[in-house]
Amino acid sequence: VEMSKVLGQPVVVVNKAGAGGTMGATEVANAAKDGHTMGMLPVGPMTTQPNLRTLPYGPDSFDYVCLVYSNPQLLLVRADAPYKTYGELVAHAKQNPGKLNYGSSGIGSVPHLAVVALAKAANIDVFHVPHKGEADALASILGGHITMFVSHPTFMTAHADKIRALFVLAPNRLP
């Protein structure tokens, strides 16, 4: 509503999930360059995905306006999970190799690669379950279909009674 008032025309918001954010980025890149299409793109489709596959867009496909937000990522588990710390999760994974899984917003997304790095550092075997987007991965962890999920603090605060953060992937501790 506020954007409509400022711009003097209707604003339609379309959430386009899929392929780690590249579906939405492709749609924005292919839109007419008439100033009527804006994209709020996460970091993955702009930095990670171009290094993993050939995409129908590149850095020059967009006119960049601003950085809207920057937030840390959290390693989330269900509130009723048997582990209360990352160390306990690692110990559980080592005792049950290949039994733990994790969701992400897509192959090559920041959450996917974050868990790959964590698993490699801890020398544990976990199974990746890619989702269409973060909302789908959140539904999977809330439903007990995945063991863990890396996401931003918004999901944690909105579902604090159902999920728990084991640690923050950021240079500083969160308040």
Regions found by a protein language model. Name each.
Residues 156, 171-175:
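Short, intrinsically disordered, charge-balanced linker/junction segments flanking boundaries
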Residues 55-59, 144-151:
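Short gly/ser/thr-rich secondary-structure transition/capping motifs
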Residues 1-12:
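Signal peptide-proximal N-terminal region
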Residues 3-5, 30-36, 43, 50-136, ...:
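Hinge/capping helix and adjacent helix->loop/strand transition within the periplasmic-binding protein
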Residues 10-26:
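Early extracytoplasmic/lumenal segment of secretory-pathway proteins
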Residues 23-33, 116-121, 135-145, 154-162:
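Short helices/loops that flank or line small-molecule/ion binding pockets
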